[in-house]
Amino acid sequence: GKEKGTYERGTSLIVDELKRNWEEHGVFKYWVMDDTFNDTNYKLEAVAEAKEKSGVPLDLTVFLRLDLQNRLKQTELIKNCGITSIYYGIETLNPDSAIAIGKGWHPDEQMAYARELKEKHYHDKIKMFTTFIWGLPEDTKESVRADYKKLLDFEYNKFDHVYMNFLFMRDTESYKNSGAVPTEGE
C-alpha cells in the first residue's frame, strides 16, 4: 500500500491541471475521491493555493472527517478551498454502537459541532451530507427509533442531506430476535 504523503501532487501541477481543464473544457466541478481529504492541513492548503493561483471558480465535493476538522482547526481552510459539498461519515447516534465501530467522538458532540459549522460558518454556501447505519452491533429497536427521532429534529440535525443504511447482513436467529431489525408492521 501507499505511505501517507507519497502520492500527493505539488501545487504547481494542480494549478496547471485546473487551468487546462477550465480553459479547454470548462471544467470547474470536481469530486475529490480521497476518503480522508483533511487528514493533513497540507492538502487543504495546497488546494486553497491552487484555487487562488489558477483563478478557476472551483466547486469541490469532498469526504472529510469531522473529528479532524475540529481537532486541526480546519474550517477556514475548508472555506478557502472552493468546497461546496462535504460528506461526513458520522455513522451512528448510538454512543455504544459508535464505540463498537471505532468512533472515538461522542455522536451528540459531533452533531453539536455540525450545527456550529452550519449556523456560524457554512450557512447555505456549503452543503453537508452524512450517512447513518442502522443495525450496528449495539443497536436496538429503541435506539434506532431514538436516532430517527433526533434526525427529524431540525434544531438537532442541521445536515442538508441524511442517508440511512440498514444492515441486514446479520442474518442469524439471535440477531433477528434481538429487536434491532424492525419486523413487518413496526
Language-model features, listed with the residues they occupy:
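Radical SAM [4Fe-4S] cluster-binding motif and immediate context
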Residues: 1-124, 134, 149
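Short, electropositive alpha-helical surface patch
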Residues: 43-52, 139-159
